[in-house]
Amino acid sequence: EFVKDVFEGFGNTGIHAGLIGEIGCSWPFTENEQKVVRAGARAQKVTGAAINIHPGQNEMAAMECIKVADKAGAELSRVVISHVDRAVREPANRIELAKTGCTLEYDLFGREGYYPPRFRVIDVPNDARRINEIKELTDKGFEKQIFISHDNYTKSSLCRYGGWGYGHILRDAVPVMKIKGLSQELIDTIMIENPMRMFTFA
């Protein structure tokens, strides 16, 4: 199905997938979810497309997803882990995840609320903290493994309903990145070069 979505498109729409996923995983990481991650790895080999994985809500969930993808033969430099800003809170774990070669996606820009207690994440970092964490990663040489976005999936995310809208990163976050010491070259790497490389089929 993944291969068909890339090569033939979705139904009769003429629209083709540009990546594999987002593959949704939960915690505990179920066998069926692991099977889908393995299928994504196989589809990556055939299509050359990148894989995007949504990890479950556990500090080690992202690493477990990467282990399954790696064992299935995925090219980890073309695997993106979503929601790092809520899923991997310990700095050492972020570094270990980056060392695998995968891309860490900070995709909750503009969201500063809390997740329900059942997710066991009460404090969600604000944009300033997100940028601090990104700088920590770039300082260690992982600038080519960072994605950023805003996970605008509800009406409340849109400007007309009181949200930040789709311009938030360019309008608000980039100036803060510069204040916090990220060079224009680093910003261009994160915002232009990384997506361009990931969305180019290997």
Model-derived segments and spans:
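Short acidic/histidine-rich active-site segments
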Residues: 106-107, 142-163, 187
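Acidic (Asp/Glu)-rich catalytic clusters
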Residues: 5-15, 42-45, 70-74, 94-101, ...
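Active-site beta-loop-alpha junctions enriched in small/polar residues
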Residues: 25, 56-58, 82-87, 109-111, ...
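Distinct, well-ordered alpha-helical segments
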Residues: 31-34, 58-73, 90-98
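Mid-to-C-terminal alpha-helical segments outside catalytic/metal-binding sites
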Residues: 168-202
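Active-site gating/metal-coordination segments in enzymes
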Residues: 1-46, 103, 110, 120
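Structural preference for beta-strand elements that scaffold enzyme active sites
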Residues: 17-19, 50-52, 78-80, 101-105, ...
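Active-site glycine- and acidic-residue-rich loops that bind
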Residues: 81-91, 111-135
